[in-house]
């Protein structure tokens, strides 16, 4: 009987990508088959996130649930990876001594040998080092599962925002070689992928070495990815305003494969708070980027990240954030109440804003952005949208599901599985709070 691998992933799309590569790696080197049931697994891996305090506590809660499985099966290997592993290292075993393997985001390629060593020596294996981009050289070609795929193009971040742990858990920015990224995209396209999402903590800071020794920027990478036969849509995340260049904006105007959606985190609409966050740009500079982008692509939709209740945030600071929300017209956000992360400069700042005030501000922010997003969705009713069909609807097996260019989920009546992976013209009939509903007009089956 084949041995089983269970992976649970917390956090960002980079972690989702890393988890898929772990499955590829262990499938090739140890013939492990992925299971959705931790109780039947021979190897359990938890890919962690340390951005939020609650996410970190969630790690040890989950490990506690698996302790009984380890007691029942001493041969079970439990591994912890991702950013909590990178941050805590061997200290994870102080709270969870039954963990066998601890690895960081940059050492996941060493998993086969670490698992083997844990089994043969019965001793814990810990490696949370930063061997730059070596992991990509030792990973197999990615397996394709559907018409969309993630492609990591760079790792780490060198911006050192005062609130953020990423530079400490994933290291400084390192870009993959340009040709390696293109080769991975070609492989995906040849196996049916039609939409790629390029990933990086600061993805538009990509500077990849080409075969002729040049450094190619992100705008050039986008143009070459768009030229790959079979790739019809390109998304990317996450961007930093400092790296959102005129060349990148021009690419949005000229490359039709780039979707009409961008995620550009701003965190706050107050210059005073942005300075304390060490974001190294002003609100005016951010709005200037947005104005140029909207001039290049008038119907583009924009989402962002916000932190509410950063130490020292006043009512005036929050009002300035809400003004930015109105001025830009964000239609979606990842927004959170500030939580201090150990080891970051902001953790030393006095955080004396009452929790109730923080919660109230977050509710106001999220409510307004949700309203703006819903207004955009309502304006789409009556239009015809080109949808990339990705799967059956999660709520109704008689419906298919896809996504618009501006990142709306669309459900429509159709039970033909051959349409999955294809593009379809769908008339939008109704706007729901979190999705659209439509009617299939036309599709192109290959």
UniProtKB/Swiss-Prot annotation:
Record protein name field: tRNA-2-methylthio-N(6)-dimethylallyladenosine synthase
Catalyzed reactions: N(6)-dimethylallyladenosine(37) in tRNA + (sulfur carrier)-SH + AH2 + 2 S-adenosyl-L-methionine = 2-methylsulfanyl-N(6)-dimethylallyladenosine(37) in tRNA + (sulfur carrier)-H + 5'-deoxyadenosine + L-methionine + A + S-adenosyl-L-homocysteine + 2 H(+)
Needed cofactors: [4Fe-4S] cluster
Primary location group: cytoplasm
Cofactor note: Binds 2 [4Fe-4S] clusters. One cluster is coordinated with 3 cysteines and an exchangeable S-adenosyl-L-methionine.
Residues involved in [4Fe-4S] cluster 2 binding: 157, 161, 164
Gene: miaB
GO cellular component: cytosol
Radical SAM core domain residues: 143-375
Subcellular location: Cytoplasm
Coiled-coil segments on the chain, per record: none
Gene3D superfamilies: Methylthiotransferase, N-terminal domain (3.40.50.12160), tm_1862 like domain (3.80.30.20)
Binding site for [4Fe-4S] cluster 1: 12, 49, 83
Role of this protein: Catalyzes the methylthiolation of N6-(dimethylallyl)adenosine (i(6)A), leading to the formation of 2-methylthio-N6-(dimethylallyl)adenosine (ms(2)i(6)A) at position 37 in tRNAs that read codons beginning with uridine.
Similarity field: Belongs to the methylthiotransferase family. MiaB subfamily.
């Amino acid at each position: 009987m084949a041995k089983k691998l269970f992976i649970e992933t917390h956090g960002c799309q980079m972690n989702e990508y890393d988890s898929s590569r772990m499955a590829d790696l262990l499938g090739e080197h140890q013939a492990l088959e992925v299971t959705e049931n931790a109780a039947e697994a021979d190897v359990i891996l938890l890919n962690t996130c340390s951005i939020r305090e609650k996410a970190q506590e969630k790690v040890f809660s989950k490990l506690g649930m698996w302790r009984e499985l380890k007691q029942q099966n001493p041969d079970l290997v439990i591994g912890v990876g991702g950013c909590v592993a990178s941050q805590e290292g061997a200290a994870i075993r102080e709270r969870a001594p039954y963990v066998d393997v601890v690895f960081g985001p940059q050492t996941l390629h060493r998993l086969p040998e670490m698992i083997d060593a844990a089994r043969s020596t019965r001793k814990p294996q810990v490696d949370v080092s930063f061997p730059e981009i070596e992991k990509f050289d030792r990973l197999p070609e990615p397996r394709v599962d559907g018409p969309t795929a993630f492609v990591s193009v760079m790792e780490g971040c060198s911006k050192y925002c005062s609130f953020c742990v990423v530079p400490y858990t994933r290291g400084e920015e390192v870009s993959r070689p340009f040709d390696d990224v293109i080769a991975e995209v070609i492989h995906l396209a040849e196996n049916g992928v039609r939409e790629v999402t390029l990933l990086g903590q600061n993805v538009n800071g990509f500077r990849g070495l080409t075969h002729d020794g040049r450094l190619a920027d992100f705008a050039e990478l986008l143009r070459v990815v768009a030229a790959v036969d079979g790739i019809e849509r390109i998304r990317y995340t996450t961007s930093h305003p400092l790296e959102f260049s005129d060349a990148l904006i021009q690419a949005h105007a000229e490359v039709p494969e780039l979707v009409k959606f961008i995620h550009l985190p701003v965190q706050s609409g107050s210059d005073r708070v942005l300075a304390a966050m060490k974001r190294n740009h002003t609100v005016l500079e951010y709005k200037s980027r947005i104005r140029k982008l909207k001039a290049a692509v008038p119907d583009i939709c924009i989402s962002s990240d916000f932190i509410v209740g950063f130490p020292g945030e006043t009512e005036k600071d929050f009002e300035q954030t809400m003004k930015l929300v109105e001025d830009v017209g964000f239609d979606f956000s990842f927004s959170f109440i500030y939580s201090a992360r150990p080891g970051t400069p902001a953790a030393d700042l006095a955080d004396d804003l009452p929790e109730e005030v923080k919660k109230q501000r977050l509710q106001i922010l999220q409510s307004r952005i949700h309203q703006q997003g819903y207004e955009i969705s309502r304006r789409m009713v009556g239009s015809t949208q080109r949808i990339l069909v990705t799967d059956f609807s999660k709520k109704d097996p008689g419906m298919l599901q896809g996504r618009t260019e501006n990142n709306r989920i669309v459900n429509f009546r159709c039970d033909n599985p051959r349409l999955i992976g294809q593009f379809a013209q769908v008339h939008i009939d109704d706007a729901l709070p979190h999705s659209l509903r439509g009617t299939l007009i036309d599709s192109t089956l290959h």
